[in-house]
Amino acid sequence: LRNSCRAYKKALEKYYPGPSLPIYASKANSSIFMSNLIASEGFGLDAVSEGELLTALKGGVPNEKIVFHGNNKSDKEIEFAIKNNIKVIVDNDHDLKRLEEISNSFNHDIEIMVRFTPGIECHTHEYIRTGSFDSKFGFGIESLGRLFEVISKTKHIKLTGLHAHIGSQIFELDPHNDLGKIMVDVILQAKDFGHNIKELNVGGGLGIKYTEEDDPPSIDEWIKTVSLSVVKACDKNNLNLPILMCEPGRSIVSTAGVTIYKIGSFKEV
C-alpha cells in the first residue's frame, strides 16, 4: 500500500514541476485504517457520503485535503461539508442550487470544484466509462459558460478548481493526454468569467492487472502522460501551473491482497 502511494508521489515530483496532491479514491477501500495510512503518506481523500467523510476525518485526513463527490448529495451531507470546510465537487445544477441555498442559510463560504464531461471516449466497460458526453456524471462541456456565469453571481460559493474523470480500468494513455489540453482550455474559459482556477483534478482510472492478458501502464507512465499534457498546455497559454490532483483507488489497494470466496452452489445454464 505504501509503495503504491509513494510511486504516485515520486512520479508527480519527477514529472510535474508545479504543486500536486494525489487524492485516494476511498470507494476502493473505505476504512479508518486506510484513511490513516494515506494521510500519513501525504495524500488527500475523496468521499461520496457522510459516512466516508466521517471515516476520513476519524482516520486523520485533514479537512482541507478532502473532496466531496457525488451526483445526488443530500442536504444533510452538504451541510456537513460546509460546516467542516470540506471542498465540494459540484456535479449538476441541482447540486449547485442546494449548495447555494444551504451556504446562504449558514452565511458560510464554501470552495468548490466543477466536474464536467470532456467528451473523451476510452476502451473500457460502458458502466465505468464516465468521460463521454452522455455520462450521468458532471456538466456537459457545452454548458460550462452558463454555469460559470451563474457561479460568479453567488454570494458564498468560490470556484477554485475543475474535475474530470474519463473512466475506470483504462489501459490507454492517449485519453489522458487529451484530457490535460481540454482541462486547460476550460481554465481559460472560466477565467473569462472572473474565476481563478488554481486546481486541476484529472480523476483516476489507471487499470490494474486482473488477467494474464491485461497489460496496464505503470503508475510512472500514467503520471508522466497526465503531467506533461498539463504542463505543455499551460506553457502554450502562458498560465501558471495549477495544483495537479489525481484520484487513484484500485491501483493503490489492488496488489495488497486477494479476496477468496467459498463456492456454495452451482447453476447449470
Language-model features: where?
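Short active-site-proximal "capping" loops at secondary-structure junctions
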Residues: 1, 28-31, 251
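Short, glycine- and charge-enriched coil/turn segments that flank and shape catalytic ligand pockets
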Residues: 14-18, 105-107, 216, 236-237
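C-terminal active-site-proximal or functional interface alpha/beta core segments in diverse enzymes
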Residues: 168-269
